[in-house]
Amino acid sequence: MRVLIGFLAFSLFIVGAGLKPAPTTADPVNREFWTWYVQKMPPEDIMVKATCRGIGQNLYVFVNDVDWLRPVTQADVDRIIEAFDRSTPADPQKGIYQIATEAFGLPPDKDGDPKIYILISELGEFRGHHFDGFFRYLDQTNEKGSNQLDMLCVDAHDPASEYHLGVLAHEFQHLIHWRYDQEEEGWVNEALSELCMILCGYYTDKRHVETFLKHTDRPLVAPGHGATSYGACLLWATYVYDRLGPEFIGWWVREPGQGIKGFDDAIKHTAAGAGVKPAPTFNSLFADWMVALYINDPGVQNGLYAYKSLSLPFGPFCEDVTSYPSEREAEVSGYGIDYIRFSLPAAGRLGIIAEGDSPGLLIEVIETNKEDPSLTRVSEHQGKEANILVDNNGGIYGEKEVVVAVTVLEATEKPVRYHLKATLEQ
């Protein structure tokens, strides 16, 4: 398993080192950098010797001397410069730097040099988890152990692969975000970094998407710097981008508020929240997202429940109910999702009584017809109790599929209990 270190908040105390000025020619320049040794936790600050192996319009590429030619090559360096400066899978005329800065904003420019330092160095593993790259926030401070410059670190194993170029885009958003909001909640920062990968054309975290779609009960919202579902973050931020557009994304990054409040405040500053009544909110968009993950059809509701910027490998896992009456006692995390699917035969009537322990309990009922997707209907029920009735209109259109998506619209420390009782009349 590979993991990204993006926004760690460790307190590091270490003796500083003299910093050399940035290179100004394409000739190799030697210097020392502070970096993290991540093969133990919390990570330790260590110093490595590196040589500049390439200079682009927006970056310097340094390679740890012990990794040069084993395994890092000049071809790797050249490809990284090409991707960062000039060309990405999303746009052959735009590099990672241009796409990211247009979408999210400018990097901090800690040292007064607009170029970004890229350090390629073997990162290794910790307890079976391989590290791919990180933005080391300490470099944006004047503390001991800081390089005092804008720098990203990428693992030395195949550093110019599409996967690691995606990591570079991901970590670059973290660097940009530091300039605007150093206190942002981790799940928001990770969501925007995953979006940066998608905007640059690196859908290389698809395995995280697949994991989430198999386990959608993993919460999107992890307050503070709690455990993050990268799959949920990627799918959420991309859906928000497709719904609200690039202008909103820029406001979201620059909004000084954090978490859900910051999201809602950002909407108020953009066209996304102007002239629309009621204006969208985090919770209303989350409800639509629950439906979009299942439907993902541009032909339904004028594309309200569909992705434009990516394709889903498959739909979310659903628990199927095939016999009646049926009862389900379960739990769902705040901003996690459970999907329960019922088959409604022709001329059938499905009744569902729902009750839960939280007033934030939300149920989205999705009615679909396999023969005619235009007949898809969505209804919403919120509160501790709900009585849901789905009538198949006398069976005119044949069998109907009914999916109940359940969540709690509040962050919770523990999952919330709910109960569903379903009956079928024919």
What is each PLM-predicted segment?
Residues 1-4:
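Positively charged n-region of N-terminal signal peptides that target proteins for export
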Residues 27-46, 93-98, 198-226, 325-333, ...:
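Generic detector of solvent-exposed, compositionally biased contiguous segments
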Residues 6-14:
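Bacterial N-terminal signal peptides
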Residues 23-25, 259-426:
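Beta/coil-rich, acidic/histidine-enriched accessory regions frequently appended to metallopeptidases
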Residues 27-74:
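Acidic/polar low-complexity interaction segments
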Residues 140-147, 162, 166, 181-243, ...:
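Acidic/His/Gly-enriched intrinsically disordered linker/tail segments
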Residues 57-185, 192, 202-206, 214-222:
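Juxtacatalytic substrate-recognition/specificity segment
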Residues 17, 21-22:
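Short, low-complexity intrinsically disordered segments enriched in A/P/G/S/L with frequent Arg
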